[in-house]
Amino acid sequence: MKEMSANTMLDSQRQQKHYGITSPISLACPKEIDHIYTQKLIDAMKPFGVFEDEEELNHRLVVLGKLNNLVKEWISDISESKNLPPSVVATVGGKIFTFGSYRLGVHTKGADIDALCVAPRHVERSDFFQSFFEKLKHQDGIRNLRAVEDAFVPVIKFEFDGIEIDLVFARLAIQTISDNLDLRDDSRLRSLDIRCIRSLNGCRVTDEILHLVPNKETFRLTLRAVKLWAKRRGIYSNMLGFLGGVSWAMLVARTCQLYPNAAASTLVHKFFLVFSKWEWPNPVLLKQPEESNLNLPVWDPRVNPSDRYHLMPIITPAYPQQNSTYNVSTSTRTVMVEEFKQGLAVTDEILQGKSDWSKLLEPPNFFQKYRHYIVLTASASTEENHLEWVGLVESKIRVLVGNLERNEFITLAHVNPQSFPGNKEHHKANNYVSMWFLGIIFRRVENAESVNIDLTYDIQSFTDTVYRQANNINMLKDGMKIEATHVKKKQLHHYLPAEILQKKKKSLSDVSRSSGGLQSKRSSLDSTCLDSSRDTDSGTPFNSPVSANKPSNPDSPTGEIERSSAEPVAVVVEKLPSVPPAQGLSIPVIGAKVDPTAKAVSSPAVCTIPTVVGRNVIPRITTPHNPVQGQPHLNGISNITKNVTPKRSHSPPTDGTSKRLKDIEKFIRLESAFKESRAAEDRKRKPMDSIGGESMPIPTIDTARKKRLPSKELPDSSSPVPANNIRVIKNSIRLTLNR
């Protein structure tokens, strides 16, 4: 009998459909306690408005039905105007497809709908942005209609009966569009222009994800929880270098493939388990990439050298496969890995009955994490200009993060995705002001009592990029300004209200750091880090409120000096070598002598999942306490010691850890050989273009030049060199850090 029951279990496991590029880690079915934890998870999410009621769902369906009818009417009319035969006009069709969070079934209350208008071959893109746009103009219930034709994915945005809709367009190389059209068929991409392929890609990826998960309802609930957690923890933003909705969906889908029968509460825990131990930059794949004869560019590090430098690749499952996380930087990956580890520790506590789900959804206190911040301010003179300006500046903040983390003295630059209204007292000229905050961790320097750090060029390169982009697209108007200021944590109250800055209830990591076992480590870190509070800031820009509200005291016991330059533009006259008039002036960056190996992108040294899985290699798993060797704990201190951290007081029991390691070990043995062929070779190559040790051309101003940008920003680098060799520097930020 025992043998028969064992055979029955094996047969049932063989019959279960296999998802993903490896076999599952566990086929265990949920227990009663798992369902209880899942219901508690649902209850914890309800106050955040993640679930729509039946009435709201039906309203969305009605709106989409109206839009679908409008599209069919428009395509029929335009077919008739192009003298197609009546028999063809009657059957030409047309259809609206949804994608994104709405198609996945995880949209929240009030969320917009991403939709795709699919038209037959005789309908041009220009028709969509002209005649269909005009048709929408005269439609009842449509408000805030605007077209963004020059976007990466061209789109028409509008509000239809209270529902915001982003509508993109694609025409297929077929004569009619039937209601049962399947966009997952790769042949639909044949003979299409790149804009149509991009428009179709959203639907194709979304549909493919849903086809690659074992249980759609469990996937949706798990994804709702993970997306809410990511938003609450400040790591939900593709634009700023974190992850967007599609990337989070693919990570959750991969977790569902590894634990196909698990309940949502278990899957949330396993999500943190898998990705806190993932060896980036190994790619996350939902299926093996498929070959196609369409010759479209796909993500493939073996072919494309630039793909080898992606830090956190998550590959879309639909052809042409792309990396959805190309914006991720070293700093944003570091922050996310730390959050994965924090999430694992919290869910361990929850599933042990020591805590509840609300703890997982607690926001971090970003303004208590770091000792140093950069305040980025975007201002404009009118509300309309401000909305445009803020959108452009925000889209370029990741350029600033990249500049800062390439600075040899900076370990981490952490941008808070939330923007804040500016203090009007400090920006009396402009009534519309937005601020972003970047937490900075400075790197220690061996055998140095103090270090002079100049961030001027990092900031100026960023502001030049934004102004130049605005000028190129004719957006730049009078009153549009960017300012960057260095402030210390104790100065933040000049910028933000007390309720935002006040210390919240201690987080799990704060509790662990305050435990006695970590006191010795903290003191050793402080003694080897130049990120102390006794630093000297000699370059805070003119607009810092500190200079106006807190006079410097040179006789203070700590020797702290806080002085700010009094003018917005620092004019530095230097004896520079003569330069021919036709050439630009090249000034080396401060600290240009950088060891190339120190600035190259490298894989984190987490030793939990081996990079190469060989036939004769038995994976050996260790569990380092630091997220990445040499990676900073996100508390404003650069962690560069190799000491082993004592076991945290809230760590799970040893037997639980052992079980988790067995799960991961099983996963390792089954992991795909997709990455084997290139891992060893590619890791030897380092991106030289990310090294910050080369000279940067500093643009100069010709005083005889008649045309100036409205923003008074520096002109482009082709400007002639003035005869008096005066270098104009804006947003000057210089500071001195003492040990």
UniProtKB/Swiss-Prot annotation:
Q: Where is this site: Interaction with RNA?
A: F152, K157, N327, R398, D531
Q: Which residues carry this modification: Phosphoserine?
A: S23, S524, S602, S651, S711
Q: Where is this protein found?
A: Nucleus
- Biased region (Polar residues) positions are 509-531, 538-556
* The species this protein was found in: Mus musculus (Mouse)
Q: Which residues carry this modification: Phosphothreonine?
A: T657
Q: Which InterPro entries match?
A: NT_sf, NuclTrfase_I-like_C, PolA_pol_cen_dom, PolA_pol_NTPase, PolA_pol_RNA-bd_dom
Disulfide feature: none
Q: Which family does it belong to?
A: Belongs to the poly(A) polymerase family.
Q: What is its main location?
A: nucleus
Q: Which keywords describe this protein according to UniProt?
A: Acetylation, ATP-binding, Magnesium, Manganese, Metal-binding, mRNA processing, Nucleotide-binding, Nucleus, Phosphoprotein, RNA-binding, Transferase
Name the domain of life: Eukaryota
Give binding positions for ATP.
Answer: F99, G100, S101, T108, D112, I113, D114, D166, K227, Y236, G245, V246
- Any one GO BP annotation for this protein: mRNA processing
Cofactor: binding details? Binds 2 magnesium ions. Also active with manganese.
Function, in words: Responsible for the post-transcriptional adenylation of the 3'-terminal of mRNA precursors and several small RNAs including signal recognition particle (SRP) RNA, nuclear 7SK RNA, U2 small nuclear RNA, and ribosomal 5S RNA.
Q: Which GO terms describe its molecular function?
A: ATP binding; metal ion binding; poly(A) RNA polymerase activity; RNA binding
Cofactors: Mg(2+); Mn(2+)
Cell division keyword on record = no
For this protein, the Enzyme Commission number is 2.7.7.19
Task: Enumerate composition-biased segments (Basic and acidic residues).
Answer: 677-688
Q: Name one GO cellular component term.
A: nucleus
Mind telling me what this protein is named? Poly(A) polymerase gamma
Matching entries from SUPFAM superfamilies are given as: Nucleotidyltransferase (SSF81301), PAP/Archaeal CCA-adding enzyme, C-terminal domain (SSF55003), PAP/OAS1 substrate-binding domain (SSF81631)
Positions of post-translational N6-acetyllysine modification: K2
Region: Disordered; residue ranges are 506-566, 677-725
